[in-house]
Amino acid sequence: MIMVGSASEPYPKEEEELLLMRRSLEVIDRFEFGVSLRTKSIRLLRDLDVLENIQRKTRCVVEVMLTTADEALSARLEPAESTVAERRQLLKALRDAGIPTVVTLGPVLPYLTDSLENLQALLADCVDAKVYGVLLNGFGVTLRAGASAYFFSCLRELSPELPEAYEALLPPGKVGKTASFLSPNAAALAELFGTSTAACGLVTDPEELFAFRHAFQDRRSGQQLSLFDLYDL
């Protein structure tokens, strides 16, 4: 399996003209590798035909990242990314194409995306799209020391009260240092996440999800070759 998108978005706006991702997928398809993609972008659907070819021969898994069910908030938090509606469309299109999906929820931003209503809405989208599982790395956000100034400036743009509210989540002496901001709703969110995913049959174990995304499958092994398989006709 070839992993794509673990460090950066494989479908930025420039991909519309450059077609680098499509050409890469065509090479993966030609040499019959499997692929596991992580994205936030509906632009992936442009290459759905290639992904379907890969899925027929080997294995294709797509991991879609969801942050909020609120369109207005999504536009402010991720202005360069696909909208909430577009990500729903992406998940449903992959479902209809028979391509398995996993969803990563997050980051969970205190006072922004940490409401029970938001989590319920996102999980409902996952159930509707028949995703295999949901990965959630905690009920808060970790901030490295070097990123604190920029992060807090962004919080201030969203609401002047947010920086002070975030500082109140930290123990004394941790402001400006690497720290985790745990949502005040963490306990309630954890309970809702656990009961809802169990009731819906969504896999949440990180190791199982890792194995699912990385497992290669040769769907054509054992097939009888024909004379025409030997030639590029």
Where are these regions (language model features)?
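Conserved AdoMet/S-adenosylmethionine-binding subsite of the radical SAM
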Residues: M1-Y166
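Auxiliary Fe-S-binding modules of radical SAM enzymes
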Residues: E117-L233
